[in-house]
From Swiss-Prot:
This is Heat shock 70 kDa protein. Transmembrane segments: none annotated. It comes from Trypanosoma cruzi. InterPro entries: ATPase_NBD, Heat_shock_70_CS, HSP70_C_sf, HSP70_peptide-bd_sf, Hsp_70_fam. It comes from the Eukaryota. Belongs to the heat shock protein 70 family. One of its GO terms (molecular function) is ATP binding. Keywords: ATP-binding, Nucleotide-binding, Stress response. PANTHER family: HEAT SHOCK PROTEIN 70KDA. Residues 643-664 have a biased composition (Gly residues). Residues 643-680 are annotated as: Disordered. NCBIfam families: PRK00290.1 (NF001413).
């Protein structure tokens, strides 16, 4: 059954979050671990693929094949200095296949595999989709996905492609601070006052500042700015570098940066220390056998942390100043400053922002980790035709973060759409040829704020050919830029004299995936999902056999049944159970069918003996007998599972007898699934 509405997904650098409009409000949906945010991590092992908490929990044991930060790669070129710098901090391998597109290389099921950043992001999106589906009990097909306001066209396109690979129709790409503004302003729609609101959004990997006016239900963005590469991870990097140096100093030059596992354990401890410093004046790091069997203990004060990250913290104020300049607004005219993103919990960041606005009290009424997904869910509800008094008349007027234009003679950037123009928008301009008898024109589309195109970002190129060769300056070529509500650009050009027309096809020279590549990735995503389901079924079958074996073992050793079961029967069951458990230990990777076959064999042997025993006990006047003949029925085999008692039957024990089910039930460690030991 398909869900008619759409979900809102905040696809974060370090954590992601999903929400849906239900019963006149937004529900932020918890994952299977009960957490309302899910790590944007994907891990590949010899036997399975893990996404979210499961992936992050095993990262220290498997650093090379655990991928995170895909958002810092998406829509970027391999040669980008930012990518080259990040690669020094990542334990996984990033390569290029010669087309300047970064791909991530991992070992998966014994093979070397490569994944595009879009594919990794699509895996995180499919996990968020799955979280929503288990909550709604329906299949989800549509979503609104958020991106940093300062994401460029390539990064937006790539995020949309990731949604397609995950099997989602992305109804809209919206800017994260704009989504947060909806979360903040939704309950203020009816007060009728015009408010100037500044959203300060500092997350795990990106930073955005957006200034908007909320007037009734109209959310009009005035200006936006930011840094697509600044966030909590950069603060973690400073801490990691600091403690790596300290370890070297304390341990005769031992360099732990050569050991990926040690580095990962240190990074996890640094992340924890950073969070502690938001509420305490100092934090202690303790890691056993960190490197070369040397234990590491160190303390860091909040003041030292603020010094290490001082320039990064202060750097957040420059986009705030630029936004106010672009909007031609004085800081005193800002009514509310709203903090969004986990990194705004850092006291120094709060102090800097408050001081900048002359001691203004910062608004913390919205949950910083969930505000973006909340706003995306509201927009998803509106875009699928949802009607509610709260969202009635809600109108979002967003802007483009970067100037868009084409290259003209001499490498000059001639802009058609200026930054902070409200979208959607369409602009046209007439150009002509530069040389006599020019049969065609080569149109190059750029985005950026610099005067020369060499300092701007190339989005794509296309040709308009077949122009009659007149003298220079005669042909009238109309170039049209059409920027949609997602902030994604379409460009067309027409020669007025001949009616010759062409438009840009965003191909691989722009770093975007081709249609064929997207289709291949969609097929592969479906294949991986099917393999994941097979893996779960195999584990269920294995646990089913183990649970059944332990239940039988506990049943025949139960003091309540002593003397009620023949010694020979007890020996038969005990011996069969021991044999099954030994086989299990030696066959951890057997198929689902093999586990089921083994369980069936064990059931066929145990069921008649156990049935006779219980009938004998019932005949002896066991209080209440066995109601309903053991629900789920024993004949035909007790269906797999038996968590905490006999499967499909005798839930909670036979009334009036054998309280609590068969004592011991299933072995605790097997009934509750594998235990996860936390790695420092």
């Amino acid at each position: 059954m398909t869900y008619e509405g759409a979900i809102g997904i905040d696809l974060g650098t370090t954590y992601s979050c999903v929400g849906v409009w239900q019963n006149e409000r937004v529900e932020i949906i918890a994952n299977d671990q009960g957490n309302r945010t899910t790590p944007s991590y994907v891990a590949f092992t010899d036997s399975e693929r893990l996404i979210g908490d499961a992936a992050k929990n095993q990262v220290a044991m498997n650093p090379r094949n655990t991928v995170f930060d895909a958002k810092r790669l998406i829509g970027r070129k391999f040669s980008d200095p930012v990518v080259q710098s990040d690669m020094k901090h990542w334990p996984f391998k990033v390569i290029t296949k010669g087309d300047d597109k970064p791909v991530i290389q991992v070992q998966f099921r014994g093979e070397t595999k490569t994944f595009n950043p879009e594919e990794v992001s699509s895996m995180v999106l499919s996990k968020m989709k799955e979280i929503a589906e288990s909550y709604l009990g329906k299949q989800v097909k549509k979503a609104v996905v958020t991106v940093p306001a300062y994401f460029n066209d390539s990064q937006r396109q790539a995020t949309k492609d990731a949604g397609t690979i995950a099997g989602l129709e992305v109804l809209r790409i919206i800017n994260e601070p704009t989504a947060a503004a909806i979360a903040y302003g939704l309950d203020k729609v009816e007060d009728g006052k015009e408010r100037n609101v500044l959203i300060f959004d500092l997350g795990g990997g990106t930073f955005d500042v957006t200034l908007l006016t909320i007037d009734g239900g109209i959310f009009e963005v005035k200006a936006t700015n930011g840094d697509t590469h600044l966030g909590g991870e950069d603060f973690d990097n400073r801490l990691v570098a600091h403690f790596t140096d300290e370890f070297k100093r304390k341990n005769k030059g031992k360099d732990l940066s050569t050991n990926l596992r040690a580095l990962r354990r240190l990074r996890t401890a640094c992340e924890r220390a950073k969070r502690t410093l938001s509420s305490a004046a100092q934090a202690t790091i303790e890691i056993d056998a960190l490197f070369d069997n040397v234990d590491f203990q160190a303390t860091i004060t909040r003041a030292r942390f603020e010094e290490l990250c001082g320039e990064l913290f202060r750097g957040t104020l420059q986009p705030v100043e630029r936004v106010l300049q672009d909007a031609k607004m004085d800081k005193r005219a800002v009514h509310d400053v709203v903090l969004v993103g986990g990194s705004t919990r850092i006291p120094k960041v709060m102090q800097l922002v408050s001081d900048f606005f002359r001691g203004k009290e910062l608004k913390k009424s919205i949950q910083p980790d969930e505000a973006v997904a909340y706003g995306a869910a509201v927009q998803a509800f509106i875009l699928t035709g949802g009607k509610s008094k709260q969202t009635e008349g809600l109108l979002l007027l967003d802007v483009t973060p970067l100037t868009l234009g084409i290259e003209t003679a001499g490498g000059v950037m001639t802009s058609l759409i200026k930054r902070n123009t409200t979208i959607p928008t369409k602009k046209s301009q007439i150009f002509s040829t530069y040389a006599d008898n020019q049969p065609g024109v080569h149109i190059q589309v750029f985005e950026g704020e610099r005067a020369m195109t060499k300092d701007c970002h190339l989005l794509g190129t296309f040709e308009l050919s077949g122009i009659p060769p007149p003298p220079r300056g005669v042909p009238q070529i109309e170039v049209t830029f059409d920027l949609d509500a997602n902030g994604i650009l379409n460009v067309s050009a027409e020669e007025k004299g001949t009616g010759k027309r062409n438009q840009i096809v965003l191909t691989n020279d722009k770093g975007r995936l081709s249609r064929a590549e997207i289709e291949r990735m969609v097929r592969e995503a479906a294949k991986y999902e099917a393999e994941d389901k097979d893996q779960v079924r195999q584990i269920d079958a294995k646990n089913g056999l183990e649970n059944y074996a332990f239940s039988m073992k506990n049943a025949v050793n139960d003091p309540n049944v002593a003397g009620k079961i023949e010694e020979a029967d007890k020996k038969t069951i005990t011996s069969a159970v021991e044999e099954a458990l030994e086989w299990l230990n030696n066959n951890q990777e057997a198929s689902k069918e093999e586990y089921e076959h083994r369980q069936k064999e064990l059931e066929n042997l145990c069921t008649p003996i156990m049935t006779n025993m219980y009938q004998g006990m019932a005949g002896a006047g066991m209080p209440g007998g066995m109601p309903g003949g053991m629900p789920g029925g024993m004949p035909g085999g007790m269906p797999g599972g038996m968590p905490g008692g006999m499967p499909g039957g005798m839930p909670g024990g036979m009334p009036g007898g054998m309280p609590g089910g068969m004592p011991g039930g299933a072995n605790p460690s097997s009934s509750s699934g594998p235990e996860v030991e936390e790695v420092d």
